[in-house]
Regions:
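Conserved phosphate-binding loops in N-terminal lobes of ATP-dependent enzymes
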Residues: 3-78
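A short acidic Gly-Thr/Ser loop motif
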Residues: 11-17, 146-151, 247
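Feature marks short, surface-exposed loop/turn motifs that line or immediately flank catalytic pockets
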Residues: 17, 78-82, 152, 250
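Adenine-nucleotide phosphate-binding core of ATP-dependent small-molecule kinases
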Residues: 39-65, 188-254, 258-260, 267-278
Length: 287
């Protein structure tokens, strides 16, 4: 990143997709026309996953005249050794076949980039950092971030510091841990217990007309789990300021409606940046 070239090639790797785009570090804006999305099967073999991941990087470089040796910031789910680029993901229902691999080296070879120019950041930390860089913290000295999707992401930002992964997904809760009660597969399991097959929350919500009582019960229970976790996180970090994102957060108004008084005790903002937040946060590693 130089004065003449303020762009960083940023990517957000999720459980079902990878999105890459150029971020202008002068304005901290994503260059929308540079954005490339590519689906990925997180249960595929390692070679197939890495090949799928590399596609949007190469397309952005080819389509947008990014530098031949670009700076690359990647928002990556955990567990992951972010400093050394080694995947520790296992038993997460995604990317098990990458366990122990040097992702920095593998991607560098496929993209045609220099390994030293690739940096990784936890996806939840990237999300929160991006929201902060976009000015969404409203002057608060400390803000918590939660991402709800195929996994549970948590992060903490304090003024003067970068956002850090809070790593609370494995917090003991009920019969397992917090993540197992707050992510997409929870909705799949709960619906299955009622003889309903869905792939996630969106399909479940579409059944409210035909299975109103069942869907309402599932949503009510999820709302309770979410409130419990927000309360736990807030008390742990001694702040009531939170920003929540991820695909599940799009149904925030529904979850809040089951107990608005309890939720409104916290200052909660729902991300309006979407995946742009993680892209900006990934690029911010080079700020």
């Amino acid at each position: 990143m130089t004065q003449n070239n303020p762009f960083v090639l940023a990517a957000d790797i999720g459980g079902t997709h990878v999105t890459a785009a150029l971020v202008d570090t002068n304005t901290w804006q994503v260059i929308d026309e540079s954005t490339v999305r590519h689906s990925v099967n997180s249960h595929a073999d390692a070679k197939s996953i890495l090949s799928a991941w590399s596609v949007p990087f190469r397309e952005v470089i080819r389509n947008r005249l990014a530098p031949a040796t670009p700076l690359i910031g990647i928002a990556m789910p955990g567990p992951f050794d972010y400093e050394n680029g080694i995947s520790h993901m296992r038993y997460q229902d995604k990317y098990d076949n990458l366990y122990g691999m040097d992702i920095r080296m593998e991607l560098a070879e496929r993209i045609g980039a220099k390994g030293r120019n690739i940096r990784f950041i936890n996806d939840a930390a990237a999300f929160l950092q991006g929201e902060v860089f976009a000015g969404r913290h409203n002057g608060s000295p400390k803000v918590l971030g939660i991402t709800l999707g195929t996994g549970l992401g948590t992060a903490v930002w304090e003024r003067g510091s970068n956002a850090m992964d809070a790593d609370l997904w494995k917090t003991p809760y009920l019969d397992t841990n917090a993540e197992e009660h707050l992510v997409t597969r929870w909705f799949v399991r709960k619906a299955s217990q009622h003889g309903i097959a869905v792939t996630g929350l969106r399909e479940l919500l579409a059944l409210r007309g035909t299975h109103a009582a069942i869907v309402a019960n599932i949503l009510t229970e999820y709302s309770s789990h979410l409130l419990h976790f927000i309360r736990f996180f807030s008390e742990k970090e001694a702040t009531d300021r939170l920003i929540i994102g991820g695909n599940i957060a799009k149904a925030w108004d529904i979850f809040r409606s089951f107990n608005p008084t309890a939720f409104d005790r916290f200052h909660i903002r729902i991300s309006q940046l979407g995946e742009h937040a993680a892209l900006i946060g990934a690029a911010a590693q080079f700020a």
